[in-house]
């Protein structure tokens, strides 16, 4: 199987997001890379599931709370940006202040 660089990136993001989700489910507070991966992977899947850009942006702000991450992480994450594949093409999605 041959994967393009973009496909490899998406797969790595998915894998990091899955690891973060497992840690979150165990009650482990997420660090910076885990929080970004968790949010970004969920945004990718939401876009793939058919949500609109606006819906994905709103959804992204509901995924993590301050209690889900280590101290100071929420203040470090000002925005999360991904290129997501929607039914009508690839679009840039930005979620501002995603950890509330």
Curated annotation (Swiss-Prot):
Protein localization: Cytoplasm
Keyword Hydrolase in annotation: yes
EC number: 3.5.1.5
Catalytic activity of the protein: urea + 2 H2O + H(+) = hydrogencarbonate + 2 NH4(+)
GO molecular function, one term: urease activity
GO biological process: urea catabolic process
Alphabetized InterPro entries for the sequence: Urease_gamma (IPR012010), Urease_gamma/gamma-beta_su (IPR002026), Urease_gamma_sf (IPR036463), Urease_subunit (IPR050069)
Uppermost EC category: hydrolase
Protein family membership: Belongs to the urease gamma subunit family.
Designated name of the protein: Urease subunit gamma
């Amino acid at each position: 199987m041959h994967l393009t660089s973009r496909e490899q990136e998406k797969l790595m993001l998915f894998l990091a997001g899955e690891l973060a989700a497992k840690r979150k489910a165990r009650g482990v507070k997420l660090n910076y890379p885990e929080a970004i991966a968790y949010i970004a992977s969920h945004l990718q899947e939401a876009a793939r599931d058919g949500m609109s850009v606006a819906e994905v942006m709103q959804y992204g702000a509901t995924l993590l709370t301050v209690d889900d991450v280590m101290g100071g992480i929420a203040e470090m994450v000002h925005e999360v940006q991904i290129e997501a594949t929607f039914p009508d093409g690839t679009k840039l999605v930005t979620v501002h202040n995603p950890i509330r």
